[in-house]
């Protein structure tokens, strides 16, 4: 980092951190997404009994900083017949996985799918009622971009990394506040019209805001700047 000519960061929060901590100017070039093909619920119905809009989805690594414990605690007190689908691998944190299963054992609406990929992953994103990311800590949450690109209504914690992505196009709760998360989940389950309104604008918003053309353009600009600097150094050294 000390000797880097240029630094690229994925979020404005990290950009501010580098500025305040190291006095370094950085280039903010976020992750991006393409609009995916939506898929009907076939594989997930056969394997898990899931149908369109029948579940709330979390998808990511099962680690403490993702806030999954809050999500399970909050969901257990939500009055709904929808399921909570927690999809993802334990990422070498088997003890945390066991803790989550112990916490969820009395609620048969909570489903742990394990690691998911391919067509089944597409189906989970395509048919969720809402997608939730209750994280305490994030960089640039690619799963959130992906969820919105599928046209999902998203419920996220109010950490800067999530808030700067969704702006006013998603539902937001107070980080680590189980009661507030429960109320937001309940409200979403009770008001499908509001959920639908968020769904209708999610994909267009996120694919326009985070598109690959801009990423390529900005990255090439950084590369061009580096090449120009290198050429000037070579000329001065007469190499």
Label the predicted regions.
Residues 1, 115-116, 123-128:
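Short alpha-helical donor nucleotide-sugar binding micro-motif in glycosyltransferases
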Residues 13, 32:
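Carbohydrate-associated surface elements
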Residues 33, 59, 83-98, 114-115:
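Glycosyltransferase donor-sugar binding loop
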Residues 54, 58, 63-77, 98:
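A conserved mid-protein helix/loop that constitutes part of the nucleotide-sugar donor-binding site
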Residues 97-119:
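Nucleotide-activated donor-binding/catalytic signature segment of Leloir-type glycosyltransferases, i.e.
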Residues 136:
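Aromatic "clamp/platform" in nucleotide-sugar-dependent glycosyltransferases that forms part
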Residues 149, 153-156:
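Short hydrophobic beta-strand element within catalytic cores of glycosyltransferases
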Residues 171-179, 187-193:
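Conserved acidic donor-binding segment of nucleotide-sugar-dependent glycosyltransferases
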């Amino acid at each position: 980092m000390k000797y880097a000519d240029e630094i690229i960061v994925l979020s404005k929060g990290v950009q501010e951190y580098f500025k305040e901590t190291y006095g370094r100017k950085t280039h903010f070039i976020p992750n991006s997404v393409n609009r995916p093909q939506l898929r009907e619920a076939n594989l997930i119905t056969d394997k898990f009994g899931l149908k369109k809009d029948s579940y709330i989805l979390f998808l990511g690594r099962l680690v403490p900083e993702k806030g999954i414990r809050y999500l399970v605690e909050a969901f257990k007190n939500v009055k709904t017949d929808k399921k909570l689908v927690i999809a993802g691998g334990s990422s070498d944190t088997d003890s945390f996985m066991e803790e989550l299963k112990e916490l969820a054992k009395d609620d048969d609406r909570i489903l742990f799918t394990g690691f998911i990929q391919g067509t089944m992953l597409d189906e989970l994103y395509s048919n969720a009622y809402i997608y939730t990311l209750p994280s305490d800590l994030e960089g640039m949450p690619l799963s959130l971009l992906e969820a919105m690109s599928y046209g999902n209504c998203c419920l996220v914690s109010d950490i800067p990394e999530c808030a700067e992505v969704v702006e006013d196009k998603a539902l937001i709760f107070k980080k680590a506040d189980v009661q507030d998360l429960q109320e937001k989940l309940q409200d979403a389950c009770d008001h499908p019209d509001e959920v639908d309104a968020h769904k209708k604008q999610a994909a267009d918003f996120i694919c326009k805001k985070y598109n690959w053309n801009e990423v390529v353009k900005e990255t090439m600009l950084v590369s061009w700047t580096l090449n120009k600097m290198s050429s000037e150094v070579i000329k001065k050294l007469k190499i």
